Regions:
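Extracellular beta-propeller repeat domains
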Residues: 2-124
Length: 124
């Protein structure tokens, strides 16, 4: 099972990472835990919109096993998960390793490592 976490006091972590100084001033909270049908390996880049929603991908899992695109929406009691797309690994692609990018209109864009209509894996 994968978990998406929130790092509290993120600014000090960023500064610490740049200066290579260690500290223990941060804590983490699990904000969502993925089950297999919701996706597996949620270790890709995340994107946020102006409403505070978090978007990302899982490399595997989902309805067809080829990975997913998901949205997490903040609520008063936590985070609500929405499965936006489940890849088949066929012509629609699969294994979206790099997450998504969101444009000004709210459209999501991303790439997949496998599948597609071409004849070679990883793109031609």
């Amino acid at each position: 099972m994968n978990a998406l976490i929130r790092i509290k006091n993120a600014a000090p972590v960023f500064v610490i990472a740049l200066s290579l100084v260690t500290a223990t001033a941060t804590t983490t909270d699990v904000i969502f835990s993925f089950e297999e049908d919701e996706g597996e390996y949620a270790d890709t880049d995340l994107e946020t919109d102006s409403a505070g929603n978090i978007y990302g991908t899982t490399v595997l899992g989902g309805e067809f096993g080829g990975g997913t695109v998901f949205q997490l929406t903040p609520t008063p009691t936590g985070w609500e998960h929405a499965l936006l797309y489940s890849f088949t690994g066929g012509v629609d692609g699969g294994e979206p390793y790099k997450g998504v990018t969101i444009d000004r209109r709210g459209n999501l864009y991303g790439t997949a490592v496998t599948g597609g209509s071409g004849g070679c894996e990883g793109g031609c």
